């Protein structure tokens, strides 16, 4: 994190939250400054140590460090969540399509979709059964995310119990609900000369054969399909790289979480993802820069039950998924964005 970004966060927190302002106690002794409190929270997140890490460095008690971390994460979400965890607009999708078509050869690709488990050491005993899965070493909570080629996280959904698989998480995620409710932004494109009304996500083999999902061939029968399988698996690693960078930047996510509630875990996870996107923007790696907070986006009307049923039917229409996969697997993967 750059010094400029750190000072920006400190100034915004001091301006909007009384907790981060320096105040005197009953004896007139001044307490910690906003810079000290933000440094405390960032040290815990970056190094992944326990909350007594600042005993000697900042002369800050363990409870103060823990409270500061909670206020810091909540402040980051409230101040920056609307910008750095926003849903892409139509204009954003045009830029995303262009970048992914140039970098990966996939026109219409919105991003890569996958899940990550975070160990929960202090999971209540009564909940351990539903948070434990055989391939994990203990209770976990699942994060589902969508990442771009530059590792920007467009969508994050955290809080599903660890016993679920990727299909269960996907089926209950707001990402799928937005498509069914017709709230998801859509931009059409062409694949192999065929018109496609909306984009898609690259996923691994466990995900269902939905129209917004592109998987690879399990057993390619010719060189073109084998090449497609290689490129698809390589491009899908964007989300794996993103998870690796998140854990490397914020070691707190690599270690088992010691929070007592999932809400505190959720605040930490979303705060780390938001700061991850802020760092990418500060380094000039962001694809979309057209966020205008003054413009109030028009609320989407509620879809009727009939519309929801039709959208769900179109979403689960396997022939569309198969046709799109064949288009990519039988020709050179070059397409153009269709401005509709």
Residue locations for each model-derived region?
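Short, polybasic Lys/Arg-rich linear motifs in disordered N-terminal/cytosolic regions
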Residues: 1-340
């Amino acid at each position: 994190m750059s010094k400029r970004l750190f000072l920006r966060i400190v100034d915004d927190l001091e301006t909007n939250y009384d907790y981060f302002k320096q105040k005197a106690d009953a004896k007139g002794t001044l307490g910690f400054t906003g810079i000290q409190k933000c440094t405390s929270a960032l040290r815990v997140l970056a190094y992944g140590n326990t909350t007594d890490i600042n005993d000697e460095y900042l002369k800050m008690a363990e409870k103060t460090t823990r409270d500061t971390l909670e206020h810091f994460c909540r402040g980051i979400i409230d101040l920056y969540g609307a910008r750095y965890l926003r849903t892409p607009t139509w204009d954003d999708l045009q830029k995303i399509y262009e970048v992914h078509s140039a970098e990966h050869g996939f026109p219409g690709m919105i991003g890569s979709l996958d899940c990550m488990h975070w160990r929960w050491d202090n999971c209540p005993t009564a909940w351990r059964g539903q948070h434990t899965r055989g391939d994990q070493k203990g209770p976990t909570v699942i994060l589902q995310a969508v990442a771009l080629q530059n590792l920007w996280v467009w969508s994050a959904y955290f809080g599903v119990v660890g016993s679920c698989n990727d299909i269960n998480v996907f089926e209950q995620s707001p990402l799928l609900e937005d498509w069914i409710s017709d709230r998801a932004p859509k931009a059409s494109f062409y694949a192999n000369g065929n018109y496609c009304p909306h984009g898609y996500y690259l996923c691994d083999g466990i995900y269902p054969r939905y129209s917004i999902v592109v998987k690879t061939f399990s057993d390619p029968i010719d060189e073109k399909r084998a090449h497609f399988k290689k490129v698809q698996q390589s491009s899908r690693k964007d989300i794996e790289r993103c998870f690796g960078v998140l854990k490397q930047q914020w070691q707190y996510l690599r270690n088992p979480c010691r929070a007592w509630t999932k809400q505190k875990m959720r605040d930490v996870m979303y705060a780390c993802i938001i700061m991850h996107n802020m760092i990418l923007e500060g380094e000039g790696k962001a694809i979309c820069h057209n966020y205008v907070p003054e413009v109030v986006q028009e609320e989407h009307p509620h879809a009727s039950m009939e519309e929801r049923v039709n959208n769900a039917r179109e979403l689960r229409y396997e022939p569309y998924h198969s046709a799109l996969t064949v288009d990519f697997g039988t020709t050179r993967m070059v397409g153009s964005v269709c401005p509709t």
